Amino acid sequence: MYKSVINIVLFCPEIPNNTGNIVRSCTAFKANLHLIKPYGFFLNDKRMVRAGLNCWDKIQLFEHKSWEHFLQATTENKTIWLLTKSGDKTPDQICMTNKLPNELYFVFGQETKGLPKTIMDNFKQNQIRIPIWNSVRSINLANAVVCILYEYSKQNQYSNLDKQCA
């Protein structure tokens, strides 16, 4: 297992295949994964298990009963960023270096609804967006997570990754 300062948070994920793919991506980039209930599937859903491949014994996975439980259960030294279409900043405009004293948490909303307004209102200054062409409503959740994981790795000179392929 690994200890990471980067945390991916899925708020009430709905699609098991997306979550399984995110398990695999978080493992590949050595990121912790937090799932906030309720889910739109069971954790043993065969589509999720298949999408996660052989990463289930390697992932740092945390489950939370609610948003409030997530906030209480995580470290006090944290910076929370919400991913949203209306964010003022893009991932390259925020500091993600692992030299920060805080753990980084990147929160992604539900595939169909995004994040609730109450959460968005509490983190107005910490909203980022992944730039895409305006004619497209959104990108797939699993792909959005990889965009953030890659930017984190890039800002840290890929120090969280192996430099050579297996």
Swiss-Prot record:
It is found in: Cytoplasm. It catalyses: cytidine(34) in tRNA + S-adenosyl-L-methionine = 2'-O-methylcytidine(34) in tRNA + S-adenosyl-L-homocysteine + H(+); 5-carboxymethylaminomethyluridine(34) in tRNA(Leu) + S-adenosyl-L-methionine = 5-carboxymethylaminomethyl-2'-O-methyluridine(34) in tRNA(Leu) + S-adenosyl-L-homocysteine + H(+). Disulfide bonds: none annotated. GO terms for cellular component: cytoplasm. Pfam families: SpoU_methylase. One of its GO terms (molecular function) is RNA binding. CDD domains: SpoU-like_TrmL. Belongs to the class IV-like SAM-binding methyltransferase superfamily. RNA methyltransferase TrmH family. TrmL subfamily. This is Putative tRNA (cytidine(34)-2'-O)-methyltransferase.
